[in-house]
């Protein structure tokens, strides 16, 4: 491209990219145009967030761990972390039991899978060491100038890591982030303090709720270590094939069932989900449900939970999961996410995942007459 595109065109392209990146931090005209295209046209948003929310978002993005430290001190009790540690251990044990019981996987591959599971690096709440921002200069001269300095500081921090051992204690998300992640190159799972709140987690709720909500999230991230991408990395985070050829073939055949199912989902008139693009996340949702449900039943076996508001513990488990993904989404955003997001739409993370789970049929007495019923031979069975 560099040799074929005229130099002036390359200059214009770089100038446009700079303005595009800076637009939301410049004068009102730039901000309005940026919103009109990216938010109104692409996502269907009707109005811009108030200035104070946009400013808070900027500080959160540039000084994430400063904000995170304040958030943790105010909103993250030690008891929440302790409960999460117990949940993670139970989920890890459950996934291990499921791997051992797999009929389609050989013993040599199982041994490698269990080794990888046992060496998960678990991060909960917040990092042990906070970032030092003392060299980042913030002035009253210009909003965009502050952003430039923050970007330069972040870039310098990244470059300084070159040639040094990987710091496995570094976090890739801030504590206040409402999310979680699995990183295959470090074989780590991370659950920031921000996700440990309703509707994902409730210190006052029973195990039916917490295993159905945050428990499935934990299982989801663990399963990422064994999805179509994660399974290609070994326990040390190296891109290395540790599967027998037959086991890899079995995995691919089972994963294709998932692809075919989601490919058949019509998310809007004439628009279908992309089963291949969303495969890793769909496998993780499926595995998360299976692993967390098994851990939930084991944790409550000695002291069964009562029926509450006419709902059994098993029903409340699945309702808690559904509540996590309940949302109101604009038609424009449905199209946008279907084309660009590796996650299935919230509706289908529920209605596409639950018909694959045998325990869901038992909990709600789902029969062939019900619209979400899926014959056993058509259900996904991986982890």
Residue ranges, per PLM feature:
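Intrinsically disordered, low-complexity linker/terminal regions across diverse proteins
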Residues: 49, 53-56, 60-383
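Noncatalytic, helix-rich "gating/capping" subdomain that lines the substrate-entry/channel surface
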Residues: 1-86, 90
């Amino acid at each position: 491209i560099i040799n074929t595109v005229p130099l002036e065109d390359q200059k214009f392209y770089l100038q446009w990219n700079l303005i595009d990146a800076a637009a939301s931090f410049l004068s009102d005209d730039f901000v309005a145009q940026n919103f009109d295209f990216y938010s109104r046209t692409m996502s269907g948003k009707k109005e811009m967030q108030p200035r104070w929310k946009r400013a808070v978002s900027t500080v959160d993005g540039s000084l994430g761990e400063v904000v995170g430290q304040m958030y943790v001190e105010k909103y993250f009790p030690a008891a929440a972390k302790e409960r999460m540690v117990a949940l993670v251990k139970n989920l890890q044990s459950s996934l291990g039991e499921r791997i051992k019981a797999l009929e389609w996987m050989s013993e040599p591959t199982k041994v490698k899978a269990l080794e990888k599971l046992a060496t998960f690096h678990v991060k909960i709440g917040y990092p042990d060491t906070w970032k030092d921002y003392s060299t980042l200069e913030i002035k009253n001269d210009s909003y965009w100038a502050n952003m430039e300095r923050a970007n330069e500081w972040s870039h310098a921090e990244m470059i300084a890591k070159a040639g040094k051992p990987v710091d496995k204690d570094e976090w890739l998300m801030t504590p206040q982030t409402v999310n979680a992640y699995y990183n295959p190159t470090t074989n780590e799972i991370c659950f920031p303090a921000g996700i440990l709140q309703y509707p994902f987690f409730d210190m006052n709720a029973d195990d039916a709720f917490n295993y159905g909500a945050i428990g499935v999230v934990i299982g989801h991230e663990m399963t990422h270590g064994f999805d179509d991408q994660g399974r290609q990395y070994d326990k040390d985070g190296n891109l290395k094939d540790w599967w027998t050829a037959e086991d890899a073939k079995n995995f691919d055949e089972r994963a294709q069932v998932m692809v075919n199912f989601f490919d058949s989902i019509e998310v809007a008139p004439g628009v279908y989900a992309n089963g291949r693009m969303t495969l890793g996340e769909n496998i993780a949702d499926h595995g998360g449900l299976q692993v967390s449900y098994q851990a939930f039943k084991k944790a409550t076996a000695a002291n069964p939970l009562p029926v509450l508001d006419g709902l059994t513990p098993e029903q409340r488990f699945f309702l808690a999961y559904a509540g996590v993904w309940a949302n109101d989404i604009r038609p424009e955003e449905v199209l946008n996410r279907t084309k660009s997001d590796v996650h299935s739409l919230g509706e289908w993370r529920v209605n596409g995942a639950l018909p694959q789970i045998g325990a869901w049929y038992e909990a709600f007495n789902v029969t062939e007459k019900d619209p979400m019923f899926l014959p056993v031979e058509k259900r996904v069975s991986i982890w």
